[in-house]
Regions:
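Non-catalytic beta/alpha edge segments that cap or flank active sites
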Residues: 1-121
Length: 121
């Protein structure tokens, strides 16, 4: 793992508003804090604009050469630019639908999410 033997994690926030400075990255910061409180060492937190290609590019850069958890937040709704699932599918090699289903159970609004999970490498 690493010198602290804590599992490693990275966080990607997908939001046009955060990129353009019209919104605070509340969900990304909350996710970093949640992972840290649950024993993960968060080594990277990035922000990208919405769009499948931008998400795929960011996720690939974060995943390649990294053995750990990469989590994204944002862009999983039904608006035209909410394309995080499409970008994620372009990067992962095998889907893990049970993980996405379990995450949706944690929030009453989870059923409105199109989030996906999988592995790369």
């Amino acid at each position: 793992m690493n010198e602290t033997s804590r599992p490693l994690a990275k966080v990607l926030t997908v939001s046009d508003g955060v990129v353009h400075g019209t919104r605070d990255d509340l969900s990304g910061r909350a996710l970093v804090e949640h992972l840290d409180a649950n024993g993960f060492e968060v080594t990277d937190h990035r922000v990208t604009a919405d769009g499948a290609d931008l998400v795929a590019e960011s996720l690939a850069a974060m995943c390649d050469g990294f053995a750990g958890l990469v989590v994204s937040t944002g862009g999983t709704g039904f608006a035209p630019r909410d394309q995080t699932p499409e970008g994620t599918r372009a990067v992962i090699e095998r889907e893990a639908p049970g993980l996405a289903e379990a995450m949706r159970l944690c929030n009453p609004l989870g059923r409105l999410s199109r989030g996906v999970a999988g592995i790369r490498g």
